[in-house]
Amino acid sequence: MRIGLITSSPDHPVLAATAALLTARGHRVEALDPTAGPDGQAGQAGPDGQAGQAGPDGQTGPFDPPADVYLLKAHTPAALALARRLEERGVPVVNPVAATELCQDRLAMAELARRAGLPFAPTRAAADPAELLAAVEAGGLLLPIVVKSRHSRRHDLVARVDDPARLRALAEEWPDEPVVAQPYLPSTGWDQKLWVVAGQLFCARRRSELAGPEHAELPDGEGGFGPAELSAERAAVALRAGEVFGLDVYGVDLLDGPGEPVVVDVNAFPGIRGQAGAPEALAALALRVGGAESGVPRPRADGTGPGVGSGAATPAPADAGPRTAAG
């Protein structure tokens, strides 16, 4: 089977480990770099350094022929456009483009989550930080709040705002940035990071980037957080998020603490660093979606291949309950 990685960083730990597992089993893994030019041509080499198959014009690309399944790790506009073209050809992409895009719009994410009954933090949108400042000065918005870029991306805005002066500074620094605001809720200074790969849960406690002066004595590094500390309620919230957003590989950020779970973010295909068992789960998912695990090859997008006429691949049996791994 051929598995494609849509990413400009195939050496990312979870991707590299997944690729190693797949190649050890005789599968071919190809990195497709959406930043490398038209159709990611320069990124078609696999971990073994060999180039992808050439098309009629002698160049490599995602459609000559496409791989059996693609893992969509990059979330840039170029990556999403590339993945969408693959989907239009009938090639499965994990996660689907529509689900990935939904998680990049923090307002749309919050609205869908709350409609579905997920305990998502209340979220309001504004054209820019200056609009939030005007709402605070008019008494229509209470501080403290967390201000985030509406559209999630690398190096976007995420800031805790305790007073109007901080909000005024953000308005000057990010004058044209569409934003969302959430109430800043008391916490331990840690975030509970839950990651899910095809229904298998992984978890860790990480220091919150919004930890304030009251958490000055919080030790650096990761906080211990294992399966015994993950309540059934919080595990259920994480699994439900995948159903709501149509995701197979995703992360759910929860506020740490003994109270009711509060979701502050959902991420499509996050890093999942340092989680034993995550590469194995991701490799199994790729094979299942691509059709190899069932023993029934997936028909190619052009309608050819040994799987034509044999029906869909047999789905994996449903789990009796969530599987959990420690961070």
Task: Label each region the model flagged.
Residues 3-7, 39, 43, 52-61, ...:
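Active-site nucleotide/adenylate-binding loops and adjacent lid/helix of ATP-dependent enzymes
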Residues 7-43, 48-123:
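Conserved N-proximal alpha/beta basic substrate-recognition cap immediately N-terminal to
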Residues 36-63, 292-326:
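Intrinsically disordered, low-complexity terminal tails and inter-domain linkers enriched
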Residues 67-71, 194-196, 254, 260-274:
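A short beta-strand motif that forms the metal-chelation/ATP-contact edge
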Residues 75-77, 151-152, 269:
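Short glycine-rich anion-binding loops that position phosphate/pyrophosphate groups of nucleotides
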Residues 156-245:
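Phosphate-binding site of ATP-dependent enzymes
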Residues 214-261, 267, 277-295:
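A long amphipathic alpha-helix within ATP-dependent nucleotide-binding catalytic cores
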